[in-house]
Amino acid sequence: MATAVFARKKYMTQAFQDDGTAVGVTVLEVEPNVVTAVKTAEKDGYEAVQVGFGAVKSGRVNRPHAGVFAKLDIPPRRYLRELRGVSGEVGQTIGADAFEAGDRVHVSARSKGRGFQGTVKRHGFGRGPVTHGSHNIRQPGSVGASADPSRIFKGQRMPGHMGDRSVTVRNLEVVRVDAERNEIWVRGGVPGGRNAIVKVRKAGE
């Protein structure tokens, strides 16, 4: 049974509930996930399926992947990814119909990259005084002590690269499933920018 799928983040909109209230939702387009290989605990040490998704020209596919698609007699796919803990058969297609309204899902993707940022933007630090000649408007302040401990502790929040990391938002509600358009509407925002690849997994699976 398919409990997870790869999708593409499209845009945010709003949906109206039965009581007339509007809630913000993110529309995820589920391109058909074709199972190209099955991993078993006996042979591979874990249970998983490899799926291919995303349209691509045949000339853009390397030879090993082209051989896989030719053997399965399916059009080339841009991405080959694994879904752990999911069972299936080679050639099976996983789509939006694996979910239904009311399900709770975890959505994982890479967050938007923000580049090198300071502590105010990266960690939400409060700023310093902006008047009376202060030069410490957005400075992080003291980061260590003097003679003891005479070092900076590990984990100290400091300026650095922000974003572009794997983020999972848990327990989002599936508001609507449109099997004809291969769309899943989930309540709230999900990581990543427009057209980002996201993994949707049922909560508790």
From Swiss-Prot:
Q: Which Gene Ontology cellular component terms are annotated?
A: cytosolic large ribosomal subunit
**Any one Pfam family match given in the protein's UniProt record, by short name:** Ribosomal_L3
Q: Which UniProt keywords apply?
A: Ribonucleoprotein, Ribosomal protein, RNA-binding, rRNA-binding
The segment annotated Disordered runs over 128-150
Keyword Cell division recorded = no
Q: What does this protein do?
A: One of the primary rRNA binding proteins, it binds directly near the 3'-end of the 23S rRNA, where it nucleates assembly of the 50S subunit.
Name this protein carries in UniProt: Large ribosomal subunit protein uL3
Which organism is this protein's natural source? Rubrobacter xylanophilus (strain DSM 9941 / JCM 11954 / NBRC 16129 / PRD-1)
* Gene coding for it: rplC
